[in-house]
Design a protein with these regions (language model features):
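Glycine-rich flexible loops
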Residues: 1-371
């Protein structure tokens, strides 16, 4: 049995710690990497490698098989043949020719971010606090107020090779920087050791949390909306059980879906506030989230005291409108090479006074969409 490289052991331990706390990143969101020297099995000489979380894996449960191992010399040589942002997808395919040995995971679109940054360890995460800054209209200004020159703003760019070049340039130009906030996306941190990188990631996340708590309003979702607090737990669950078959049928028009229900305090509080219709309609801020949630939820615009048949009729009407709007949204943004639309049904349905219904192909996917 081949002994695991020390860099891999450290990387897995760091990934598990970061991925265990949902404040740090969403399920299967973000990626981590480590660079180190290994032995070329053909020549017996030294070879510089990077181990990075592969496509689709989850930090909290990452294994060695979920890592992609790439030769740094080949990866960095791609900078000389990079054809530009119009052909980003070709670069992801090129990563396969930088792999070291057999097995492991497929490299993700974020691979360049890790390989091009001149640091032994890199974390890229999607924490709520970081996304709040990244997606704010004045995110660049807020980032500077929060961190000074230790965390640098990087304007929105589609994930890919050019974003990796952007972040590498930011690090080189800002020697005091420990990381950056990626506009509309998340955060990236780096360090000379695994411990330093993790410490810096957590510092960015917790500092942003404290900054937002200090600057935020006491009631960010507005005051309570009269008549929207709902019944107690027993009445709420009874209403949820009555609505669930109808809602799942609506969410399964394109293909059968498994449902998950959440009536936690944070969900109920949001749905009891005056701002919830406006904020829900704005949609999801982070692109990594709406891969699972779609761009916005369907929200029942009736109080929990409305008769059941009235609520069901309104849900059917809202669902028809949602499908029409989602198809139009897809048509507006799809390109010639875009994948086919993956259905127009909502993945998230919010019912004031009752809770959140989330949907997916299986139990785990439905639960994660809700998370």
């Amino acid at each position: 049995m081949t002994e695991q490289h020390a860099c891999v052991s450290e990387l897995l331990a760091r990934s598990h710690r970061l991925g265990a706390d949902p404040r740090n990143t969403n399920y299967a969101g973000g990626n981590t990497s480590a660079k180190g020297t290994s032995t070329d099995p053909v020549t017996g000489g030294d070879v510089e490698l990077m181990w990075v979380k592969g496509s689709g894996g989850d930090l909290g449960t990452l294994t060695a098989d979920g890592l992609a191992a790439l030769r740094l010399d080949r990866l960095r040589a791609l900078e000389g043949v990079y054809p530009g942002v119009e052909r980003e997808d070709e670069m992801v395919a090129a990563f396969d020719y930088c792999l070291h040995g057999r097995g492991g995971a497929a490299p993700s679109i974020d691979t360049a971010m890790h390989g091009l940054v001149d640091a032994a360890h890199v974390d890229h995460l999607h924490p709520d606090s970081g996304i709040a800054l990244a997606c704010a209209a004045d995110g660049e200004k807020l980032t500077a107020e929060c961190f000074g020159d230790t965390v640098v703003w990087v304007p929105w760019r589609r994930p890919g090779f050019q974003l990796g070049l952007d972040i590498a340039a930011v690090k080189e130009a800002n020697p005091r920087a420990i990381g950056c906030v990626l506009g509309g996306h998340g955060i990236t941190a780096w360090g000379d050791t695994a411990q330093e990188c993790e410490r810096r990631s957590l510092h960015i996340i917790r500092t942003a949390e404290a900054f937002l708590a200090e600057r935020g309003r006491a009631e960010p979702f507005g005051p309570l909306l009269a008549g929207y607090t709902g019944a107690g737990p027993a009445g709420r669950r009874e209403r949820a059980a009555a609505l669930a078959p109808f809602i799942r049928a609506l969410a399964s028009q394109d293909r059968p879906q498994v449902g998950h229900f959440d009536d936690s305090d944070v969900v109920l509080d949001f749905l009891s506030r005056t701002e919830h219709p406006r904020l829900a309609a704005l949609g999801t801020s982070c692109p990594d989230h709406f891969l699972r949630t779609k761009v916005r939820p369907l929200v029942l615009d009736l109080p929990p005291t409305a008769p059941l048949d009235e609520a069901v009729a309104r849900l059917r009407q809202l669902h028809a409108e949602y499908r029409e709007e989602y198809a139009a949204y897809y048509a507006r943004h799809a390109g010639p090479d875009s994948p086919a639309m993956r259905g127009a049904d909502p993945a998230i349905v919010l019912v004031p006074g009752v809770g959140m219904f989330s949907f997916g192909k299986d139990k785990q996917t439905a639960r994660v969409a809700g998370e």
